[in-house]
Structures are given as C-alpha cells and as structure tokens.
C-alpha cells in the first residue's frame, strides 16, 4: 500500500489500511469485498490525506496468485520460460475518493523460476541530475539480468541502482520493492506438474 502525501499522517494511514484489511480477510470476507469495505471506511476518514493505492494478493501452493489491485503501480510478472513481462493492471481505483467504487479480483499463475515485482512509484519516478526518470525499462533490464539470482539480491540491486541513478538527490516519494520468486525447476512443456511445488521466496526492502 502507498498513501498520498508524506510524513506521519501518510504512515498512519497505511498502518490503518493493513489493520483494516486483515480484519476483513480474517472475518472471511472475499478479498474484493474486503477491499470495497476498506474503501468505504477510508472515504469516511477525516485524515487530510486519505488516498491509498493497494495491491493485495493471496498465494496458493500451486503457484497461483489471487489479487486485487486498487490503483497501485502494476506489478511486473517475469515469465522465466519466455523472458517476457506481464503487467498486473488495476482492478479498481485508488482507495478513498469514491465510497461505492467496485473492485474485482483476478488470478495469475507463476511457474517455477518466475518472478513478481511489486514497487511504489518512487522507484520508476526517481530523477537523475538531468531530470530524467529511472523508468520501467531500467527496471525490466535489471530483472532480466538478475532473473537467476535470489529475490533478496534482486531487490537489493534495484534499490542500489535507483540510489546510483539519483546521487545526492533526496527521495521525493517512498521507494519500496518486494520481489517474489517461485522456486523449483522450470518444467518442460510436456512434463507433469510437481505434486507439491516449492513456496515462493520473498525479499522486501
């Protein structure tokens, strides 16, 4: 989740989002309905900053991810077999502005070796001394170069690359990445699926 604005109010708002979402999911609400309920709560909030982008996903043992993307920058799914990318686009608007905004859930399947990157816009919008943005193309190149490295190494490389790109410039927005890699060997197209796939490995910075 990423809240509009900066400082303590934004941090408190993100904390409240996490708490509210856990309460909704813990109450056996479907994830789309839980996000809709959370959106209504935020809409009624008196906080000065109350616009929040959110990506919420549930990871299944077979590699499937069930998710809702409420206006968050689209996570990048790197397919190990084809070395191609799929962007997980929004399934609803940011939380807060509209109390009756609808949200839908979608699913994506991660095969062994696949990688998923979640990031805040402070990553791609980081500027160098000439005013150029870091951009998604640089992010994709790093993911391809590090596609066989661990999730932690990939996350650390992304963050260090952004810092090197913007030396001496204070971050204008939050810079956070989460890298999720599904472990296990990449299967041949005609090979049977393993009965118990290894769980994803996760690194966050």
Predicted feature locations:
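Conserved subregion of the PPM/PP2C metallophosphatase catalytic domain
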Residues: 1-4, 8-9, 13-14, 18-205
């Amino acid at each position: 989740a990423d809240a509009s604005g900066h400082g303590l109010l934004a941090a408190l708002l993100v904390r409240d989002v996490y708490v509210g979402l856990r309460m909704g999911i813990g109450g056996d609400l479907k994830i789309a309905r839980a996000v809709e309920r959370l959106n209504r709560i935020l809409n009624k909030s008196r906080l000065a900053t109350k616009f929040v982008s959110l990506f919420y996903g549930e990871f299944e043992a077979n590699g499937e991810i069930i998710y809702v993307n409420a206006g968050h920058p689209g996570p990048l799914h790197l397919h190990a077999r084809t070395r191609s990318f799929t962007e997980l686009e929004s399934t609803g608007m940011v939380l807060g502005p509209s109390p009756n905004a609808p949200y839908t859930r979608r699913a994506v399947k991660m095969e062994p070796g696949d990688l998923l990157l979640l990031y805040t816009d402070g990553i791609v919008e980081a500027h160098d001394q000439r005013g150029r943005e870091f951009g998604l193309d640089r992010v994709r190149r790093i993911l391809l170069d590090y596609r066989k490295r661990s999730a932690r190494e990939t996350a650390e490389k992304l963050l260090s690359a952004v810092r090197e790109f913007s030396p001496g410039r204070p971050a204008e927005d939050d810079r956070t990445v989460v890298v999720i890699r599904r472990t296990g060997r990449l299967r041949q197209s005609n090979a049977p699926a393993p009965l118990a796939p290894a769980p994803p490995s996760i690194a966050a910075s």
